[in-house]
Structure formats: C-alpha cells, structure tokens
Amino acid sequence: MNYKERRQLIYELIQTNKIETQEQLLLLLQAHGANATQATISRDIRALHISKVPDDDGRSYYVKAPSAAVNRERQLKDAIRERVATVTAVQFTVVIQTSMKLTYAPILAGLIDDIDNDDVVGTIAGTDTLLVILKDAEAAASFADWAQAIVKERKIY
C-alpha cells in the first residue's frame, strides 16, 4: 500500500471509528493490510491536518480538520459581522462600507477573493470602502442580502 492509499485509509478509519491514540490507529491500519510505523502515522496525521477533539465525555478522538474553504468562509462572516457598516447593491456590484476608518477594506476584499463563489468576479478596495463586482444584478442582490443578514447578527451591547 502506497502512502496515498494509506492516507486515504486513515481518513476513512477516523470517520468510521472513535480513535483515541496513534497506537489504536496503527492497529486498525495493520488490520486493513497497511504496514506502517508510529513515526509514519505521526507524519501522516500532521500532513493530513488531523487533530483531536474532545467529545461530551471528555475523551479526545482524531477528526479531520475543517477544510480551508470552511475556515475562510467563517473568517469572512466574522469580518462582515464585526467590521461592516453598510452593504448596498448597485446593478451588478455591491458597495461595502466598513465601520472603521482603518484600512480594513483591503483585508475584507482579500477574504472575499479567497472564498469559493463563482458569482464574484473581483473586488476593488479603498481604505474603508470595498466594491465587489459580481456576474450580474441578481448575483449582486443575493450577495448583498447575504452580507446584510450577517451584519444584522452583530450584537449591540
């Protein structure tokens, strides 16, 4: 079994079993015909971005880390919730005004550029204003509605 097959098997095993230790993982791999050392398993775990998370009983199990795409979308939502003052759709664009006069619009533009959204054509950022260019007016309205809903989630103390 080559390393790609072994790593695929590791993913399958952690999704179907509650594995607490590398030793347990090694035994399961061996039961499935994969011969590896503990050092190899440790490298595979790092390479696959597998981490341990506690369950309700306080025991920790290996799990597949959230994908980068999920993390980027969460970062974008957090940024919109915390830093955006207004969102306005104008034809096939969305104008976003940040709530801080600090150069936050370029950061927000980078987050938008990084998400996997086929409707977003590109972004242009100034200091506190961001222009999101979308493929059409319908996509712009949808994006604006999505962003406005996130802004409304902001808690005011």
From Swiss-Prot:
GO cellular component: cytoplasm
SUPFAM superfamilies: C-terminal domain of arginine repressor, Winged helix' DNA-binding domain
Pathways per UniProt: Amino-acid biosynthesis; L-arginine biosynthesis [regulation]
UniProt keyword list: Amino-acid biosynthesis, Arginine biosynthesis, Cytoplasm, DNA-binding, Repressor, Transcription, Transcription regulation
Source superkingdom: Bacteria
Family that this chain belongs to: Belongs to the ArgR family.
General function of this protein: Regulates arginine biosynthesis genes.
The protein, known as: Arginine repressor
Species: Lactobacillus delbrueckii subsp. bulgaricus (strain ATCC 11842 / DSM 20081 / BCRC 10696 / JCM 1002 / NBRC 13953 / NCIMB 11778 / NCTC 12712 / WDCM 00102 / Lb 14)
